[in-house]
């Protein structure tokens, strides 16, 4: 049970470090978009699917990129990419296409200076260290791989509904 308490404390630290200004900007972008498209790979992709469902329940037109019924994005739309690294190849390609079309782009990431972060109109940083990150942070994690980022992503998305 101590392990679970430690994880809950990690999540509290991580979520409390997220910028309120950037969160408000993301909410404004969601509210202002005709349609919202969501993308993520692996476990981050699972978290965006949950967020898509919540947005749909609120009456927003929302699509998960890669599903068979997802239409093409246009200039009045918003693409939100969840990527811890900000460098996942397929997600970078989506970000580039989004910018080429003229749609808005937001990302939730650990690394704001990564390729997707540099392309985005809005960057929400989740300061969740991973084994791959070389950055020094006040937040540490006992969890493997990107677990803290992925868990924080789920809670963050639920908190902005």
What is each stretch, according to the model?
Residues 17-32:
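A short, well-structured juxtamembrane/interface segment
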Residues 4-6, 28-33, 72-75, 92-93:
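A short alpha-helix capping/helix-coil boundary motif
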């Amino acid at each position: 049970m101590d392990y679970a308490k430690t994880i809950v404390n990690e999540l509290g630290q991580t979520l409390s470090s997220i910028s309120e200004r950037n969160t408000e900007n993301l909410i404004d972008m969601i509210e202002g978009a005709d349609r919202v498209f969501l993308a993520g790979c692996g476990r981050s992709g699972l978290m965006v699917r949950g967020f898509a469902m919540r947005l749909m329940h609120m009456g927003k037109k929302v699509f998960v990129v890669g599903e068979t019924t997802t239409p093409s994005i246009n200039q009045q739309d918003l693409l939100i990419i969840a990527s811890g690294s900000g460098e996942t190849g397929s997600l970078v390609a989506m970000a580039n296409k989004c910018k080429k079309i003229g749609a808005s782009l937001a990302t939730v990431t650990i690394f704001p200076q990564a390729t997707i972060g540099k392309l985005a109109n809005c960057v929400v940083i989740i300061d969740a260290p991973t084994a791959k990150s070389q950055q020094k942070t006040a937040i540490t994690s006992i969890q493997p791989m990107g677990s803290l980022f992925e868990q924080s992503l789920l809670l963050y998305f639920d908190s902005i509904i």
